[in-house]
């Protein structure tokens, strides 16, 4: 696979929708491989949950589904990063087997880097 000229890599986006309440809950993006920038900060998976739906387990579930898709794509070791201050994201990553490797600082911002072996 080849990186595009603008630095983007191929990706897959999955959406979480609550059919019972007819609302969009969140989304998770899976980057098929990492370029140098994503290896430092960003990682394979990024997710977002609607503010009104946070702290309900959706992020943990979405990351779990994304990890299944990573396995299907042949990604055996997955990097997921989050803001050091985002305790909820860190818990969702850890609940899916994430192991903190380190923290990196970029432009005054500290990001935690977690790896998950599939």
Residue ranges and their predicted role:
Residues 81-82, 94-113:
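Conserved catalytic-core motifs of GNAT/GCN5-like acyltransferases
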Residues 46-49, 55-72, 91-95:
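Conserved acetyl-CoA-binding loop-helix of GNAT-fold acetyltransferases
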Residues 70-81:
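Conserved GNAT acetyl-CoA-binding A-motif
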Residues 1-44, 69, 107-118:
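GNAT-family acyltransferases
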């Amino acid at each position: 696979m080849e990186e595009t000229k603008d630095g983007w890599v191929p990706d897959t986006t999955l959406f979480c929708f609550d059919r019972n309440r007819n609302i969009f809950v969140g989304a998770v993006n899976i980057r098929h491989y990492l370029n140098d920038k994503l290896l430092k900060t960003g990682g394979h998976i990024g997710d977002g949950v609607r503010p009104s739906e946070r702290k309900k387990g959706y992020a943990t579930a979405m990351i779990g589904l994304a990890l299944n898709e990573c396995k299907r794509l042949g990604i055996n070791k997955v990097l997921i990063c989050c803001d050091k201050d985002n305790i909820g994201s860190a818990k969702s990553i850890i609940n899916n087997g994430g192991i903190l490797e380190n923290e990196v600082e970029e432009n005054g911002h500290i990001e935690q880097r977690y790896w998950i072996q599939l």
